[in-house]
């Protein structure tokens, strides 16, 4: 069974109860420590591990099960060898879309019949059942508490001692919030923990804040690591409705999968797993219309020119003139941690620190989870295209930056920090080049985000870091041109622009009268779509 290890603890052994010579009476319950090997201790840790895995590797709409299934397929070398045990199949539903695939009109009838059809196969968290906590955090001890059963009102409980307050956690659910804080919040700031012992009468407020921060954590992980979506929540895009391109904004998405022709192995991998989302889009300039779209019917905003004679284009253009930062967090500097990753049995996830509580700060050197830049949304651990005009000659071949940090420096300038990479078409290399550089390419591939490993496997492309891996470059916000897209998502050239003029407090304030966020909308959305992920603004 895959184990989750808690590498840091705030536990104190001096808070444990003294049970030497202690016996149960009518008024005093008995306390018995349960050692690590005890079956009840293991059961307690299994419950903790299962719930914790849903927080760390799961999340509403998470694509982690899809990633697990694809890795199993690739490892066996047989893409058609599907492990269906992690998939819960729901009744098929049609996706409202102008068209999912643009078939060649010269294609035969047999070819067209092989085009994929969407269904609503929902991936749930069944795969988390086998997780367990390798051991309780250091200096935490589980006790079995038996109250007097002679009058028939007694009961058996399991209390966990070790919290600095000296009070015990009286249930697994109470301890889970503290355990999640121990593992995920590397700031070690107890004011951010929402367990009953740390937060006191602020428990409800902190839990609501944690819920929002956790949703942002999973959205970032899904967008940049687990299995990236083509488009992000809150982005302005073009949608194809009856062969007409209409400006729209993505307000929600839900996880889907569809059954394809099992004989077409390459197509099965690239279609089924590259784009696991359906997008819920709101037409800009007309608040009455929402569309459920497949990724093939959506294009990046930088793909087509504007017609400023049309009102809806003007509305979209005004939003794309704005930018805003969101999700303040504490960097890992100074944190004593050997390897900042969550570990699965077969995979490891980059450990992105949860955002700190509170709104936007006015202090300098703030670090941010992400940024809305014009039409697009960028995260840390993301890929962006930058202007090479200010780079030295040895870096002129830069194709994109792998973002490790977004922060405001002492001059109040937004900066992007990360490594610079180039992409090389394998067909463009001569025989000697490809032979000499193959080992270097393999080393670089290990350091890439999973999405680029996938691109390299499914296309004739190498990715290579242009500098020493211990060095990172800082790029000012003005030199960032936009997101880097996988080659199969872009149907032509992108017209990048660096023209963003107005800073706003949030995406909703930039949207203005086009705001769609209200209780009625999400109540309708949740009733219509399974496993929906609402926009984080």
Swiss-Prot record:
Source superkingdom: Eukaryota
InterPro entries: Clr2, Clr2_N, Tscrpt-silencing_Clr2_C
Keywords: Centromere, Chromatin regulator, Chromosome, Nucleus, Repressor, Telomere, Transcription, Transcription regulation
Residue ranges the record marks as coiled coil: none
Keyword Disulfide bond found: no
GO biological process: chromatin organization; pericentric heterochromatin formation; rDNA heterochromatin formation; silent mating-type cassette heterochromatin formation; subtelomeric heterochromatin formation
Composition skew (Basic and acidic residues), residue ranges: 107-116
Role noted for this protein: Required for deacetylation in the mating-type region and the centromere. Acts upstream of the histone deacetylases to promote transcriptional silencing. Required for proper positioning of nucleosomes at heterochromatic loci and for transcriptional gene silencing (TGS) function of the Snf2/Hdac-containing repressor complex (SHREC).
Name the UniProt record assigns to this protein: Cryptic loci regulator 2
């Amino acid at each position: 069974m895959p184990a989750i290890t808690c590498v840091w603890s705030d536990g104190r052994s001096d808070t444990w109860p003294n049970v030497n010579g202690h016996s149960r009476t009518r008024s005093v319950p008995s306390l018995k420590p349960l050692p690590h090997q005890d079956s009840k201790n293991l059961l307690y840790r299994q419950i903790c591990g299962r719930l914790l895995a849903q927080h760390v590797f799961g999340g509403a709409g998470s694509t982690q099960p899809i990633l697990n299934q694809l890795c199993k397929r690739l490892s066996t070398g047989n893409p058609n060898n599907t492990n269906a045990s992690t998939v819960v199949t729901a009744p098929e539903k049609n996706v409202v879309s102008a068209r999912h695939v643009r078939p060649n009109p010269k294609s035969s009838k047999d070819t067209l019949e092989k085009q994929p059809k969407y269904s609503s196969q929902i991936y749930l968290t069944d795969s988390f059942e086998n997780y367990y906590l390798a051991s309780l955090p250091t200096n935490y001890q589980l006790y079995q508490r038996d109250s007097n059963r002679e009058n028939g009102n007694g009961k058996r409980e399991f209390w966990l001692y070790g919290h600095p307050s000296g009070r015990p956690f009286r249930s697994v659910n109470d301890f889970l919030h503290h355990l999640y804080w121990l593992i995920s919040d590397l700031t070690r700031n107890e004011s951010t923990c929402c367990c009953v012992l740390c937060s006191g009468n602020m428990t409800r407020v902190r839990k609501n804040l944690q819920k929002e921060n956790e949703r942002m954590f999973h959205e970032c992980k899904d967008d940049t690591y687990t299995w990236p979506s083509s488009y992000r929540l809150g982005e302005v895009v073009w949608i194809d409705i009856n062969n007409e391109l209409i400006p729209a904004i993505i307000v929600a998405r839900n996880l889907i999968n569809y059954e394809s022709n099992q004989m077409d192995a390459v197509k099965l991998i690239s279609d089924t797993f590259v784009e696991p989302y359906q997008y819920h889009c709101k037409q800009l300039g007309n608040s009455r219309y929402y569309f459920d779209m497949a990724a093939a019917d959506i294009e990046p905003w930088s793909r087509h020119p504007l017609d400023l004679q049309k009102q809806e284009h003007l509305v979209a253009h005004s939003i794309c003139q704005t930018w805003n930062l969101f999700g303040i967090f504490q960097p890992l500097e100074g944190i004593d941690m050997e390897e900042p990753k969550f570990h699965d049995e077969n995979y490891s996830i980059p450990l992105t620190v949860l955002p700190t509580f509170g709104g936007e700060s006015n202090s300098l050197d703030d670090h941010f989870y992400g940024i809305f830049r014009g039409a697009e949304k960028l995260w840390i651990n993301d890929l962006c295209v930058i202007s090479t005009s200010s780079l030295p000659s040895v870096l002129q071949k830069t194709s994109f930056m792998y973002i490790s940090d977004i922060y405001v420096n002492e001059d109040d300038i937004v900066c992007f920090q990360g490594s610079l990479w180039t992409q090389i078409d394998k067909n463009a290399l001569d025989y000697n080049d490809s032979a000499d550089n193959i080992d270097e390419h393999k080393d670089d591939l290990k350091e890439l985000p999973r999405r680029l490993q996938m691109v390299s496997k499914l296309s004739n492309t190498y990715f290579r870091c242009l500098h020493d891996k211990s060095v990172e470059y800082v790029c000012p916000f003005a030199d960032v041109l936009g997101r880097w897209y996988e080659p199969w998502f872009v149907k032509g050239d992108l017209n990048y622009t660096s023209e963003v003029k107005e800073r706003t407090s949030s995406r909703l304030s930039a949207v203005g009268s086009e705001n769609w966020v209200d209780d009625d909308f999400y109540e309708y959305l949740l009733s219509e779509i399974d496993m929906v992920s609402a926009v984080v603004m």
